[in-house]
Regions:
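Signature of N-terminal electron-transfer/Fe-S-associated modules in redox systems
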Residues: 1-107, 116, 120, 124-128
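Glycine-rich FAD pyrophosphate-binding loop
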Residues: 218-234, 354-361
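N-terminal Rossmann-like FAD-binding beta1-loop-alpha1 element of flavoenzymes
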Residues: 196-221, 338-346
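A Rossmann-like FAD-binding core segment of flavoenzymes
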Residues: 245-296, 308-318, 322-325, 347-441
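FAD-binding core/adjacent interface of flavoenzyme oxidoreductases
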Residues: 94, 105, 118, 141-144, ...
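Residue-level detector of alpha-helix initiation sites
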Residues: 139, 203-204, 228, 335-337
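Cofactor-binding loop segments of dinucleotide-utilizing enzymes, especially the Rossmann-like FAD-
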Residues: 10, 202, 225, 334, ...
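Predominantly flavin-linked oxidoreductase catalytic cores and closely associated redox partners
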Residues: 325-332, 336-353
Length: 441
């Protein structure tokens, strides 16, 4: 049994267990002390300073959440000076941290979805209401729920207690619920304004713009160079990750909002210009052209036959164009494009598929589940390795030379910069190389 001690709070004698904090004892005796950052299951961090009290003999106010009671301690929890201090602390919090009360999961979400809100609705069985709340910020949850990197889950506060809430799958669940019900739930639409926007690009950005413009009452025409809408969602993500029937169902839902026209197989700069669209009467223009160009490796031999960009490889697969596959394939890069290219290569019959990445496994930007899936399918990984040269014969790539790396100081991204190790050059046989080191518009 813990030792009992006596102290005085606001002129009243109270008894408490040794090791308790002033805040805990006050609550046990129905004495109110305001708090903001305090959580009884977590260690006090004394961050908000709203719970300050006066302890006799101490020159400054003390945070009651982190101050242990002592025998004979005399505490004042409510005085004019204490109230003024708490008011000042609250004003400082509101002034400097206007988003302090927004959950870290929502702050991390690129779309800014009200995550707490839709999870609360799901917990009440209000699935369609949850879906409508998601669509306030994300018009394609059915699709994104299958490919989202769910940064939110890495910042979920439940990580401090056990493990994160499965935020992304809850989003996908309510979108699947609507699809399987067979009934769409369109958002409220403003009266048609008569204005029309030309949207150049039919990928996720262009489709999202058409959705929100229609909700505001404006019409749009989507112009796209490809034979079908979807952009990288359709042409850059393999079927096993994002089935085309899922994407089509969601796109159809956007087009069914009305006053959205589609023109496919037309290229900006060849078939039309901004000026020609202006002459056709469009009131505004949106460029949503995506990131289809890929970064070059910048090494000798990258112009040899058999060297592909990750985007070109995945697009040609989707379009079912003939591809002369190699047997020993090297993939350069560590993102999801690299993983997608590697897993597709395995499925197309390659003998060996090796991903070469210049940083460590922990620093790979690809989703952990995708990395694990690639390993399960037999993809090999060479971490801390960077290609320096490609060798060929008769114009065809035959060998790849890489150097081993070691991690140095962090760069601008916060990741440790890889530094080449002298004398670590290594040659491996290849007959196909796929570069997936980044994309740009």
């Amino acid at each position: 049994m813990k030792e009992k001690i006596r102290l005085t709070i606001n002129g009243h004698g109270v008894e408490a267990e040794a090791g308790s904090t002033v805040l805990q004892v006050a609550r046990q005796n129905d004495i109110y002390i305001p708090t903001l950052c305090y959580n009884e299951v977590l260690k006090p961090i004394e961050s908000c300073r709203l719970c300050v009290v006066q302890v006799e003999g101490e020159p400054h106010f003390q945070a009651s959440c982190g101050t242990e009671v002592q025998e004979g301690m005399v505490v004042t929890t409510d005085s004019e000076e204490i109230q003024q201090t708490r008011k000042l602390m609250l004003e400082l919090l509101l002034k400097e941290h206007y988003g302090d009360c927004i959950a870290p999961c929502q702050l991390t979400c690129p779309a800014g979805i009200d995550i707490q809100g839709y999870i609360a609705l799901i917990s009440q069985g209000k699935y369609i209401e949850a879906l409508k709340l998601i669509r306030e910020r994300l018009p394609m949850p059915l699709t994104i729920g299958r490919v989202c990197p769910h940064f939110c889950e890495y910042k979920c506060n439940r990580n401090l207690v056990e493990e994160p809430i499965n935020i992304n799958h809850l989003k996908r669940f309510v979108a699947d619920y609507e699809m399987h019900s067979g009934k769409r739930n369109p958002p409220p639409l403003a009266e048609f304004s008569g204005r029309k926007v030309a949207i150049i690009g039919g990928g996720p950005a262009g489709l999202s713009a058409a959705h929100y413009l229609r909700r505001l009452g404006h019409g749009s025409t989507i112009f796209d160079a490809m034979p079908a809408l979807g952009g990288m969602l359709r042409y850059g993500i393999p079927e096993y990750r994002l089935p085309k029937k899922i994407l089509d169902w969601e796109i159809d839902g956007i087009l069914e909002l009305g006053n959205i026209e589609v023109k496919l197989g037309v290229k900006w700069g060849e078939d039309f210009t901004i000026e020609s669209l202006r002459q056709e009467g469009y009131d505004a223009f949106l460029l949503a052209i995506g990131a289809w160009d890929t970064r070059k490796l910048g090494i000798v031999g990258e112009d040899l036959q058999g060297v592909w960009s990750g985007v070109d490889f995945l697009v040609d697969l989707t379009l079912e164009k003939p591809i002369e596959m190699g047997k020993n394939i090297a993939i350069i890069g560590g993102g999801n494009v690299a993983i997608d290219a590697a897993r597709n290569s395995v499925r197309m019959g390659a003998d060996t598929v090796t991903i070469i990445y210049r940083r460590s496994r922990d620093e790979m930007p690809a989703s952990p589940e995708e990395i694990h899936g690639a390993e399960e399918e037999g993809v090999q990984f060479h971490f801390l390795a960077a290609p320096v040269r490609l060798f060929g014969s008769n114009g065809m790539v035959e060998k790849l030379e890489y150097v081993k790396m070691e991690l140095g100081e962090p760069d601008a991204s916060g990741r440790r910069r890889p530094v080449p190790m002298e004398g670590s050059e290594t040659l491996i046989p290849v007959d196909m190389v796929i570069a997936a080191i980044g994309q740009f518009p």
